[in-house]
Amino acid sequence: TQGYSSAASDVYKRQDAINMVIGDTKIIAEDLGIFVPEVKALLEETGYPGMKIIEFAFSGDRFNEHLPHMYSPNSVVYGGTHDNETLVGYFKPEARQWWELQYIADYMGVSHQNEIVDKVLKTAYASVASVVIFQTQDILKLDNWARMNTPGTVGNNWRWRMKSGDLTQDHINHLSWLVDTFGRF
């Protein structure tokens, strides 16, 4: 953690200079991976929001920081990142342990597998996180064939593209309902 302490100290010293250059630009801190207390302190000091990933939430730990009831308003919630499976792929019964699927069902009120993506979206939009971000592949409910990136591989990464007509009026209506219902303007 010595390197993190030093890095955090350097950022504190440079924060005013950074703010002078970027002005009102919004920064989201990628605070994923190994927990380091200095990173948490840095986020508190700078006010930069951290990331919460719903795909990381259902490990069985009821105090997992990625569970929506653990979010703070100063956070940004994602379904997954560009390095994760799509929500459809991630929540397939064959990809998860039975207890994990049961926890997801109980937590989000899922009664059928085909409801999971809609429930994940609703849960994220209803959370206290200040910002909600989902990949288009998740809005469109696409399987892992549309995954953006698979770390440690080469060849088919960063190739998925949305085609004209993929985003339907039903998708738009659902997103509009989420934004309106949960006051995310």
Give short role names for the model-derived ranges.
Residues 23-25, 31-144:
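Conserved alpha/beta catalytic core and glycan-binding cleft of carbohydrate-active enzymes
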Residues 1-2, 17-18, 66-67, 122:
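Short, flexible, glycine/charge-rich loop motifs used to bind or transfer phosphoryl groups or to couple energy/partner
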Residues 6, 46, 51, 152-161:
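Acidic, Ser/Thr-rich peripheral helices and adjacent loops at domain boundaries
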Residues 13-22:
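Alpha-helix-loop-beta-strand connector modules within alpha/beta enzyme cores
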Residues 141-185:
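Structured C-terminal cap/extension of enzyme domains
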Residues 1-8, 12:
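Single conserved hydrophobic/aromatic residue that forms the stacking wall/gate
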